[in-house]
């Protein structure tokens, strides 16, 4: 009989770590029913809670609290790193059976690859555990929704069978993982499915390609739908050809899963660095890592987004709030935070250590997380870390909340804490060009997104000061700093997925991504509300953008505010707000004048380069403070202050 081993983070549960190190495991959707369907089968754990006995004890306590009694055999519980086959070999030995009788269930493709090396069968999601036991393959599938069907009907079918969505391209197309059994259920319900390659040890990415496409003259007189299909097919082929050429020396390689919104879906084998590929002529943020999530079909935030529109009442923010923000969110405050996390000043006062890089692969990333979490704690906020794994790295998003009793939802003020220097020029000891090495190369990220992170911290300090003076918001306010944004929105996708699974009531998300770059000319800030997700999320995000624009008029009257909306917004899917759009919540991203769209860009010229420092000529903390004040006033107004 088979022995089942499960990873915890993102597979069985979403993991959060409190300030005292205690852990909470929130079971992922459909997980408990899967475990209970194998009640008579031996089950174990292969997971890495972090170094030290205390971390393992905390993880064991959280496991029992979340899944009481379902993992009773301690001999089958294995804590430790999953960066080689060693821990998987140990699991097979503990099972006392053949390796082929052992199944490892884990979302991370690299870990599944190590499990395969140890002779284990694997499943990319708990829903496919039985398929792994029975030796049935799981495929990538493009599911088409006909005009007489909708996503809610597809969800009803998928949640009862072996189907898990990873991306909703539109109301008519969903990319999913599915077995042949799941596909039969889908097709019997009136949907169609186009099977692509097997999932095995691959993960899915959306790679956008903004280069112009010339549709053949033969389509000149064709219906608009036919021309659009031809253009999408050609764009997908061009994008995949470029990615394949860039990764030609890698083994194994990637495969195309067909056209995606603005580009191509790609299945990348374990270890393949798709996120490092940059297509010339393509706007920034063109790669998304896609995660399996049943909530992509239900979009639980839609009701809240719809209510946001109905409840939104235009009006100027209170003068008291404006004054408080002006006093706390200052150029000097922004500069001080940026200096600490970009290496211009020591990270922590009294400690000479400075930050070289906040890249997700850099050792400094965790140090910055520690420092930011510590500052939030000093402000009296409830702090926890949302833990996740990316390419063998244990990473954390940082969350800090001022909770309000009987709150009508929570307002999120967000940015991403990581950085990259991938667009820089690097040379080896002989002076020959070499690729960016995220482990050792500098990535100060003063603008991207040190400026947004600084603005979040300054807003938290402002709220703390307001509360100390006797004011209290009507809604809870939560500050979230996402990790691994530069790897395809990985941290925010993991966070938003967890929020959807736990029924988080999010009133609105205000993301700041690059707010300090200014070359001169007209002071302009961009408010990005656009999304390809249809339904209430579009209206809710537009209304949230209106609120930000009104705040800008109050605290940054010398700025031109550029509101971008709809599918034509150049930031669609390219910053962390998109992870919330996917699940139906109203969200905006506010930035410097970064995109060349209706007016020439005046933002930083050091994007993703080691020159993105506090001393860069384009880095303007006065400019950043004005944008930060705008978002702070909007957020605090939404919170009822």
What are these regions (language model features)?
Residues 336, 343-403, 560-562:
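A non-catalytic alpha/beta surface segment that caps or lines the substrate-entry region
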Residues 337-351, 375, 379, 396-480, ...:
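Catalytic-core environment of secreted peptidases
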Residues 484-587:
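Metal-dependent peptidase/peptidase-like ectodomains
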């Amino acid at each position: 009989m088979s022995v089942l081993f499960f990873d915890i983070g993102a597979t069985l549960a979403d993991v959060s770590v409190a300030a005292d190190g205690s852990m909470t495991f929130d079971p992922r959707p459909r997980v408990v029913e899967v475990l209970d369907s194998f009640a008579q089968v031996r089950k174990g754990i292969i997971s890495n809670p972090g170094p030290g006995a205390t971390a393992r004890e905390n993880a064991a306590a959280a496991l029992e609290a979340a899944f009481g009694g379902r993992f009773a055999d301690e001999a089958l519980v294995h804590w430790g790193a999953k960066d080689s086959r060693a821990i998987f070999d140990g699991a097979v030995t503990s099972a006392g059976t053949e390796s082929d009788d052992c199944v490892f269930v884990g979302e991370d493709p690299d870990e599944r690859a190590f499990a395969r090396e140890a002779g284990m069968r694997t499943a990319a999601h708990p829903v496919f555990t039985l398929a792994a036991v029975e030796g049935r393959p799981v495929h990538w599938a493009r599911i088409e929704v006909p005009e007489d069907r909708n996503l809610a009907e597809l969800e009803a079918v998928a949640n009862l069978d072996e189907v898990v969505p990873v991306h909703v391209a539109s109301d008519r197309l969903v990319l999913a993982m599915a077995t042949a059994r799941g596909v039969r259920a889908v097709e019997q319900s009136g949907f169609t499915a186009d099977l692509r390659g097997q999932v095995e040890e691959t993960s899915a990415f959306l790679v956008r390609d903004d280069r112009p496409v010339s549709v053949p003259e033969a389509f000149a007189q064709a219906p608009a739908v036919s021309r659009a299909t031809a253009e999408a097919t050609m764009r997908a082929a061009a994008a995949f050809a470029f990615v394949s050429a860039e990764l030609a020396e890698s083994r194994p390689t990637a495969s195309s899963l067909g056209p995606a919104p603005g580009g191509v879906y790609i299945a990348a084998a374990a270890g393949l660095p798709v996120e490092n590929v940059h297509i010339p002529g393509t706007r920034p943020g063109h790669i998304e890592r896609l995660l399996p999530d049943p909530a992509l079909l239900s979009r639980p935030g839609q009701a809240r987004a719809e209510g946001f529109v109905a409840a939104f009442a235009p009006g100027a923010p209170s003068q008291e709030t404006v004054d408080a923000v002006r006093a706390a969110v200052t150029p000097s405050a922004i500069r001080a935070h940026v200096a600490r996390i970009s290496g211009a000043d020591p990270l922590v006062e009294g400690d000479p250590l400075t930050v070289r890089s906040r890249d997700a692969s850099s050792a400094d990333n965790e140090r910055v997380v520690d420092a930011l979490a510590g500052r939030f704690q000093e402000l009296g906020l409830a702090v926890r870390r949302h833990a996740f794994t990316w390419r063998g790295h244990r990473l954390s998003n940082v969350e800090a909340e001022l909770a309000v009793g009987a709150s009508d939802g929570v307002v999120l003020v967000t940015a991403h804490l990581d950085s990259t220097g991938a667009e820089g020029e690097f040379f080896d000891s002989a002076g020959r060009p070499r690729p960016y090495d995220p482990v050792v190369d500098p990535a100060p990220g003063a603008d991207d997104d040190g400026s947004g992170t600084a603005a979040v911290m300054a807003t938290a300090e402002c709220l703390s000061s307001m509360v100390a003076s006797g004011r209290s918001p009507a809604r809870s306010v939560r500050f979230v700093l996402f990790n691994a944004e530069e790897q395809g929105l990985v941290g925010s996708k993991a966070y938003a997925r967890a929020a959807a699974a736990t029924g988080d009531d999010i009133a609105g998300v205000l993301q700041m991504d690059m707010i300090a770059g200014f070359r001169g000319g007209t002071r302009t800030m961009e408010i990005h509300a656009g999304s390809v997700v249809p339904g209430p999320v579009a209206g809710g995000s537009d209304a949230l953008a209106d609120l930000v624009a009104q705040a800008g008029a109050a605290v940054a009257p010398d700025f031109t505010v550029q509101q971008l909306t709809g599918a034509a917004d150049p930031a669609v899917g390219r910053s962390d707000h998109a992870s919330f759009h996917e699940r139906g919540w109203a969200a905006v991203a506010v930035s410097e004048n970064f995109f060349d769209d209706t007016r020439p860009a005046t933002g930083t010229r050091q994007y993703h380069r080691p020159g993105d420092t506090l001393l860069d000529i384009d880095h303007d903390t006065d400019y950043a403070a004005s944008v930060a004040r705008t978002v702070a006033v909007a957020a605090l107004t939404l919170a009822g202050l």
